[in-house]
């Protein structure tokens, strides 16, 4: 039962945080586009801005979700922690990609983001496990 709670809690945390960050990003993007209409050189870096800000914030959120999952599950082996964090990563990526890929195909950038997200959620769990083993 604790495993299920850990997976649900980690997934809900990631979904809620990314939803709120998405809203914040939309407000920033509207302001940026308004500013870019006056300064033409800003239009050229719009796509770069999305990747430079979005991917690191996404990875930090996935890391925190993996950390929360591992702390709630309270497992003491790397394999069990990795399984829980990987499950959270797959659930959240599946939920986000299902709506995004309804009428399109997966790109190389999407594959890289999926790999980074799974790595970040697993790293969050391993970070918790490392800190937990040191404190014992």
What spans do the regions from the language model cover?
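Juxtamembrane/disordered regions of integral membrane proteins
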Residues: 1-136
């Amino acid at each position: 039962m604790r495993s299920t709670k850990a997976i649900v809690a980690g997934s809900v945390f990631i979904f809620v945080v990314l939803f709120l960050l998405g809203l914040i990003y939309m407000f920033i993007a509207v302001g940026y586009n308004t500013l870019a209409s006056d300064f033409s050189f800003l239009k050229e870096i719009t796509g770069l801005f999305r990747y430079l800000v979005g991917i690191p914030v996404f990875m930090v959120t996935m890391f925190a979700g993996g950390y929360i999952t591992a702390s709630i599950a309270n497992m003491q082996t790397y394999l069990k922690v990795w399984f829980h964090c990987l499950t959270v990563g797959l659930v959240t990526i599946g939920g986000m990609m299902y709506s995004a890929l309804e009428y399109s195909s997966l790109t190389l950038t999407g594959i890289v983001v999926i790999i980074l997200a799974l790595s970040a959620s697993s790293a969050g769990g391993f970070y918790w496990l490392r800190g937990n083993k040191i404190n014992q």
